[in-house]
């Protein structure tokens, strides 16, 4: 896997020149974004259970039977713990994405095929949207993390919300 540094240096070398000031700014920006993602990952890693519980509470406060539509959500009848387990799973994948700097873990382990699975199990994906939307609106900089870290976290929440919608 190539890093932004090797890419910039390689491009400059191919052009028989030293890296320019804008090349260095690009590298610096990439490093700052990586630091923000790692900050968000660290904060999230220490609070999976609490964050997931907030999402579950938001879902059940808004939808007492655990469903946004006509069908009751499977995890509403089987208990809040299974809903929490699902949120923790997504949050761990979001954490992996923050560390890697891409959406690969979410795509491979959650998003690909999720609508078909939820439909087959009669799970209303809208409840996940409600929970993740609550988490997105709840985040606050600098209380929870820096503004740049919160932006990276919120981008991944948006990615999950849009995939479920």
Swiss-Prot record:
Keyword Amino-acid biosynthesis in record: no
Membrane-topology descriptor: Peripheral membrane protein
Protein purpose: Light-harvesting photosynthetic bile pigment-protein from the phycobiliprotein complex.
SUPFAM superfamilies xref list: Globin-like (SSF46458)
Modified how: Contains three covalently linked phycourobilin chromophores.
GO biological process, one term: photosynthesis
Family as reported in the entry's similarity comment: Belongs to the phycobiliprotein family.
GO cellular component terms given for this protein: phycobilisome; plasma membrane-derived thylakoid membrane
Ligand binding (phycourobilin 2): 83
Residues annotated as binding phycourobilin 1: 75
Protein name, entry field: C-phycoerythrin class 2 subunit alpha
Keywords attached to this entry: Antenna complex, Bile pigment, Chromophore, Electron transport, Membrane, Photosynthesis, Phycobilisome, Thylakoid, Transport
Localization per record: Cellular thylakoid membrane
Binding site for phycourobilin 3: 140
Subunit note: Heterodimer of an alpha and a beta chain.
Pfam families associated with the record: Phycobilisome (PF00502)
Major localization class: membrane
Natural source organism: Synechococcus sp. (strain WH8103)
């Amino acid at each position: 896997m190539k890093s932004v540094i090797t890419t910039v240096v390689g491009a400059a070398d191919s052009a028989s020149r030293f890296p320019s000031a804008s090349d260095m700014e690009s590298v610096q920006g990439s490093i700052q974004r990586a630091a923000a993602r790692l900050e968000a990952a660290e904060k999230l890693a220490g609070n999976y259970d609490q964050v997931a519980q907030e999402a579950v509470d938001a879902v059940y406060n808004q939808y007492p039977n655990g469903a946004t539509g006509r069908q009751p959500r499977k995890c509403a009848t089987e208990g809040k713990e299974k809903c929490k387990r699902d949120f923790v799973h997504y949050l761990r994948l979001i954490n992996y994405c923050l560390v890697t700097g891409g959406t690969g873990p979410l795509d491979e382990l959650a998003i690909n095929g999720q609508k078909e699975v939820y439909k087959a199990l009669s799970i209303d994906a809208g409840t996940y949207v409600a929970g993740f939307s609550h988490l997105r609106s709840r985040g606050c900089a600098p209380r929870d993390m820096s503004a740049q870290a919160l932006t990276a976290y919120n981008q991944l929440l948006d990615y999950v919300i849009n995939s479920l919608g």
